[in-house]
Design a protein with these regions (language model features):
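Alpha-helical transmembrane-bundle signature of multi-pass membrane transport and export proteins
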Residues: 1-382
Length: 382
């Protein structure tokens, strides 16, 4: 619910443009990226469930405050940006902890199916949230939609907190700085990992600019605003759901090669926004993108969980998320000015070309092309 409600809440402010939306989103993305390594260290030293739960509760309160400000008509771009700085910091604690939760409670042979189940359930909620957000924004306003979204974080935090004793790691006895350095050493020693992270840094910068700024602006100009955007978000979410279900059964011998090749539908989908294509074509394109993203959502954590030492998993995941997302704020911040200077069609064309070029590069790396799938034995050591 949050992305849709926040996007149209910002765009509904007096005189607000895509540039303002990009600024608010970048305010959240910058601390999220910069603090991610620290979040990884914390998740490898503390109960991952407790880290997730506390982050959820505080984040829920922040989202409710944003909703109240929008509902009362007192919200401004600087205030929303400031609140989103805090939200980004909390997300930086949450994100590295979550991938370590699944292998802490499942046998290794069940990791892929467990990752798939998490993705399916999350996407069912995302589908419902996207639909409800569109209806709430169109009928009662973005502020009310954000308040409902914030309440969902409070409930989630309470549920996850009940698992806090299951995921308590063994303390390393080292300082946080040393743990951070060890996580970095693990990350850079895995060539396939940092190559893909570098490539996806570019792709994520493009993706966030296109789908978080360019998309909502296009919907306001050429379609029915939040209602149309909610339909496309729901189509993508259905793609997430189908992709997660399909990915549970996929056993590619070369998972990284498969994932990279499967991602070429993304630049194709961006091209449908140029003209733009008929709305039904856009919906199909968003559905396909959702499927491809969720292939990564299921298979990529499985690769990390089976190829990275378990006691360093959250730190490696943190550097993965840090590197992959570091250009996200750049994409968000630049997309508004680029759209204003060159127009939406040129913006989407350039984004599609850059995305296609970036996807081709990792196929030149042998470790990406040739890495084999690992099938864990039952009751493998965690």
């Amino acid at each position: 619910m949050g992305p849709t409600a926040l996007a149209f809440g910002v765009l509904a402010l007096p005189g607000a443009t895509g540039r303002d939306l990009g600024f608010v989103l970048a305010a959240q993305a910058v601390p999220f990226i910069l603090l991610m390594p620290l979040g990884g260290v914390l998740a490898d030293r503390r109960s991952r469930a407790a880290v997730i739960a506390v982050s959820d509760v505080i984040l829920g309160a922040l989202v409710v405050v944003q909703g109240l400000l929008l509902a009362e008509g007192t919200a401004t771009v600087p205030v929303l940006a400031a609140l989103n700085v805090a939200a980004g910091a909390l997300n930086a604690l949450w994100w590295p902890a979550f991938p370590g939760l699944v292998p802490a409670i499942l046998d290794d042979r069940d990791l892929q199916s467990g990752n798939s189940l998490v993705a399916v359930v999350s996407n069912v909620a995302f589908i419902g949230g996207s639909a409800v957000a569109g209806v709430l924004v169109a009928t009662v306003g973005a502020g009310q939609a954000l308040m409902v979204d914030g309440a969902s974080f409070l409930v989630a935090g309470a549920l996850v907190y009940s698992m806090r004793g299951v995921t308590r790691p063994t303390p390393s006895g080292e300082s946080m700085v040393r743990d951070l350095r060890e996580g970095w050493s693990t990350f850079v020693s895995l060539r396939w990992l940092w190559v893909l992270v570098a490539v996806w840094s570019v792709i994520n910068g493009v993706f966030r600019g296109v789908f978080e700024v360019g998309g909502p602006v296009l919907m306001r100009r050429s379609f029915d605003g939040p209602t149309s955007w909610a339909v496309l978000q729901t189509a993508m979410a259905v793609g997430f759901l189908v992709g997660a279900a399909v990915a549970a059964r996929l056993r590619p011998e070369r998972p990284l090669r498969f994932l990279t090749l499967a991602s070429f539908g993304l630049p194709t989908a961006i091209l449908t926004l140029v003209a733009p294509a008929p709305f039904v074509v856009l919906a199909v394109a968003f559905f396909v993108v959702g499927m491809q993203i969720e292939f990564w959502g299921v298979l990529w954590p499985t690769v990390l969980q089976t190829h990275v030492p378990r006691d360093r998993l959250s730190r490696a995941t943190a550097f993965d998320a840090f590197g992959s997302g570091v250009l996200g704020p750049v994409g968000l911040a630049l997309s508004g000015p680029v759209i204003a200077a060159f127009g939406l069609p040129t913006f989407f064309l350039a984004a599609a070309a850059l995305c296609a070029l970036a996807l081709a590069l990792p196929l030149l790396e042998r470790e990406v092309r040739e890495m084999a799938r690992i099938d864990p034995e039952p009751n493998a050591e965690r």
